[in-house]
Amino acid sequence: MSSATVSRKSLDEARNQRNRSFFLRDIIVIRLINAWWIATFFQPDEFFQSLEPAWNLAFGSQSGAWLTWEWQHQLRTSLHPALFAGVYLVADFISSHILPVGILRATILVAVPQALQAVIAGLGDWYTWQLAVSIYGANSNVSFFALFLQIFNPWQWYCSTRTFSNSLEMTLTVMAMYYWPWELLGVAQTTKENPKPAPILKSLWSLRASLCLAALAVVLRPTNILIWATIVLFTITRISLQGPSPLTLSTVVTLIREAIWCGSLILAISAASDRWYFGFWTFPAYNFLYFNLSKSLAVFYGRSPWHYYFLQGLPLICTTSLPFAVASLYKPTAHATSTQQFNVLKTLAYTVFTTVGALSLITHKEVRFIYPLLPALSILAAPYTASFFTSQPSPTTNNPRPQPQIRNKRYLFVALGVNMFLAGYLSFFHQPAPLNVLAYLRHEYERIHPDSVQLAQTSHFSAMPENEDELFALFLMPCHSTPWRSHLIYPGLRAYALGCEPPLHTEPNTPERDNYRDEADRFYDDPIPFLTSELFSPTKALTVPRYIVGFESIEPWLQEFVQTFEAQSLGLTQVRPVWKGFNGLFNEDWRRSGDMIVWDTGVYDNAPPTKEL
């Protein structure tokens, strides 16, 4: 390597060091805007597997949080909700001193989890770029295309600032990949004087950071072990890789020692957190496998064909970059310029194949489960994207390092247009009603019960009003169709929603399991008998709500129900719409089709005016 090349490389690395902090700031600002613009509902786990247990942890068991069966049976690690519980407490402490009493405090508590998640998402994008820099070079056009693919990816825009455990898992995974010693996939460097390979590990602290972050990702989502098992397997065996291995016995011993220490540290932290949260020693990973595999409860939430990830999952997370991602998986090393780069790219490609292949064997599948692979896919697809959309002019004496020129502009603008359309539609127009209806109910509660609102704020949202037994809202819709206490906020805002707990009391492949119908199923199977004989039966002791919330398709059932003797004996003689929310152009679940409506039952005072539909 010439001195000019070395000098140029040093300048590029110095420039990258200077730009790192500025890029991180700008990326986080983009993700904060991203979080602010997300005004739609996607999946229940965004709230019920993170924010609800976090709310319960921050404000106590009387705060009204909804803990699903997974938390009652310790299937989830407490580390994820503990992160948001901390930000809840900090936000409540600061806002209580700035705004001792005021409805703006509720707005702050709704917003702070998304703000924290935006920072986490920004870190994921930034580390994706830095991992690409470590692979392709500090001044490589390809590195910036990896960042470009992350920033303009509609799936990333739609999901990265949502409080899914998969979103945090994605960031932890790419952070761990960045700190991983990829030089172990390089080639042994020997000399005639010393035929033994030189020490290859550059920094033990980077290795420890990688192992701790990887262990944390595995504790958070046990299936993340597939990614790291693949990387370690190829590092040790070098299957289909080039060049002699730089691994020595001492390096292998160091890897094993550090893996044991770092893994034990994270397991100890996780165990202590779970002991504190649940009140006794438990191992959520075992419980997760026991309930979902041994008792086959995962299939209760849906079955998908074996090819789901190949034909739906990868296209959804890649969208317009899919052709480049497919090409890179077919020939991951086509643009490699060194042996180490060849081996790293091949390992990343095999990581995608192994993870997708293994997860395809599991009956219950969701796109979110392969979300941690997105940074690797962006990095693999970046060379193909860069070569398609840019050309490199030949250097001249006056311009020895010419900037790449954009080409195929028509395709570029079409791809960007499609991405922006998808991101915009999903962010604003696809299922906004579940969030809007809770804001409406919260504001109505603030209007009708100002004393209870003041009590909630002075008690830091941890105390129920003593003499308030009003059922404020009844949700007659598929279970978990809206967020819960993270958006309702006030403990005194009592609400009831149809449940859908799996049949924990049954065994797989039994008539009891096959014929099981949860509460939401029973409502949609036969709505009027369900309402008269089950939901409002004397044994249920459910009071008549102030509001009923549901999708527009249930209105004929409600009108029929209020004509029954059972409803009229409860004082429920009419329902009238007072709020209506647009919920998108389509929905894959027929039960959620159409607008969402709030009906007033007329049994309480201070009712709002009728909403014209």
Swiss-Prot record:
<keyword id="KW-0337">GPI-anchor biosynthesis</keyword>
<keyword id="KW-0328">Glycosyltransferase</keyword>
<feature type="transmembrane region" description="Helical">
    <location>
        <begin position="83"/>
        <end position="103"/>
    </location>
</feature>
<dbReference type="GO" id="GO:0000026">
    <property type="term" value="F:alpha-1,2-mannosyltransferase activity"/>
</dbReference>
<keyword id="KW-0812">Transmembrane</keyword>
<feature type="transmembrane region" description="Helical">
    <location>
        <begin position="309"/>
        <end position="329"/>
    </location>
</feature>
<feature type="transmembrane region" description="Helical">
    <location>
        <begin position="132"/>
        <end position="152"/>
    </location>
</feature>
<keyword id="KW-0808">Transferase</keyword>
<feature type="transmembrane region" description="Helical">
    <location>
        <begin position="252"/>
        <end position="272"/>
    </location>
</feature>
<feature type="transmembrane region" description="Helical">
    <location>
        <begin position="342"/>
        <end position="362"/>
    </location>
</feature>
<keyword id="KW-0256">Endoplasmic reticulum</keyword>
<keyword id="KW-0472">Membrane</keyword>
<feature type="transmembrane region" description="Helical">
    <location>
        <begin position="216"/>
        <end position="236"/>
    </location>
</feature>
<feature type="transmembrane region" description="Helical">
    <location>
        <begin position="168"/>
        <end position="188"/>
    </location>
</feature>
<keyword id="KW-0325">Glycoprotein</keyword>
<keyword id="KW-1133">Transmembrane helix</keyword>
<comment type="similarity">
    <text>Belongs to the glycosyltransferase 22 family. PIGB subfamily.</text>
</comment>
<comment type="pathway">
    <text>Glycolipid biosynthesis; glycosylphosphatidylinositol-anchor biosynthesis.</text>
</comment>
<dbReference type="GO" id="GO:0005789">
    <property type="term" value="C:endoplasmic reticulum membrane"/>
</dbReference>
<feature type="transmembrane region" description="Helical">
    <location>
        <begin position="280"/>
        <end position="300"/>
    </location>
</feature>
<feature type="transmembrane region" description="Helical">
    <location>
        <begin position="22"/>
        <end position="42"/>
    </location>
</feature>
<feature type="transmembrane region" description="Helical">
    <location>
        <begin position="369"/>
        <end position="389"/>
    </location>
</feature>
<dbReference type="InterPro" id="IPR005599">
    <property type="entry name" value="GPI_mannosylTrfase"/>
</dbReference>
<protein>
    <recommendedName>
        <fullName>GPI mannosyltransferase 3</fullName>
        <ecNumber>2.4.1.-</ecNumber>
    </recommendedName>
</protein>
<dbReference type="GO" id="GO:0006506">
    <property type="term" value="P:GPI anchor biosynthetic process"/>
</dbReference>
<feature type="glycosylation site" description="N-linked (GlcNAc...) asparagine">
    <location>
        <position position="19"/>
    </location>
</feature>
<feature type="transmembrane region" description="Helical">
    <location>
        <begin position="106"/>
        <end position="126"/>
    </location>
</feature>
<feature type="transmembrane region" description="Helical">
    <location>
        <begin position="411"/>
        <end position="431"/>
    </location>
</feature>
<dbReference type="Pfam" id="PF03901">
    <property type="entry name" value="Glyco_transf_22"/>
</dbReference>
<comment type="function">
    <text>Mannosyltransferase involved in glycosylphosphatidylinositol-anchor biosynthesis. Transfers the third mannose to Man2-GlcN-acyl-PI during GPI precursor assembly.</text>
</comment>
